[in-house]
Regions:
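Outer-membrane beta-barrel transmembrane strands
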Residues: 16-63, 88-112, 116-118, 130-132, ...
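N-terminal glycine-rich FAD/FM-binding segment characteristic of electron-transfer flavoproteins
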Residues: 122-124
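Conserved "boundary/linchpin" sites in short secondary-structure elements
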Residues: 126-128
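Surface-exposed loop/turn segments flanking beta-strands in extracellular/periplasmic regions
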Residues: 1-18, 66-85, 131-160
Length: 171
């Protein structure tokens, strides 16, 4: 791939094809959004309402760094090797969900023509959960190999975290 090709051009001139070949990421994502709702009127003027919502996602990414030499065609030499960090491959997984459960009781009555009295009670609970995991290795055995096990075990990293949070409210 070309780098500096014109007289006086910087050796670190950008090359879009080289950037694409050097840093590649493949991502697959699965996601679900669902809602359920029920409303019931057991007595006249009294309504019960229950709803539930769920959002779930799972995303897997594979990042690959290929070593690419950019040539200076005027001097027939390598102008720049990228990335300068070497042959790295990494995998990451991001998974989580959010739930919302809500219940409501409503009473509304017309006591005189044009005059209403109403009361409402609402309870809601939300919950969020997220987990991230990642692993990386350096020094792939060959540029055509894209699996994590296709790299040396000498230089490897692992990381991850999980977090959750909830909220409960009454009105």
């Amino acid at each position: 791939y070309g780098g500096a090709m014109a007289y006086g051009e910087s050796a670190s001139a950008g090359n879009a094809v080289a950037e694409y070949e050097a840093y590649r990421t493949n991502t697959s994502r699965k996601e679900f959004n669902g809602n359920a709702y029920l409303e019931w009127e057991p007595l006249k003027d009294l309504k019960l309402n229950v709803s539930y919502a769920l959002r779930y996602y799972n995303q897997f990414s594979k990042s690959i760094q290929n070593v690419v030499n950019q040539m200076n065609f005027q001097t027939n030499s390598i102008a720049r090797t990228m990335p300068d960090t070497g042959d790295i491959i990494s995998n990451s997984n991001n998974e989580g969900h959010k739930t919302l459960f809500q219940g409501r009781i409503t009473y509304e009555k017309e006591i005189f023509k044009g005059h209403h009295i109403s009361a409402m009670f609402n309870a809601a609970e939300e919950y969020w959960f997220q987990r991230n995991m990642g692993a990386g290795r350096k020094n792939r055995l060959h540029n055509s190999l894209e699996e994590l096990d296709a790299a040396s075990k000498e230089v490897q990293t692992n990381d991850g975290k999980s977090e959750s949070e909830g909220l409960r409210s009454f009105i």
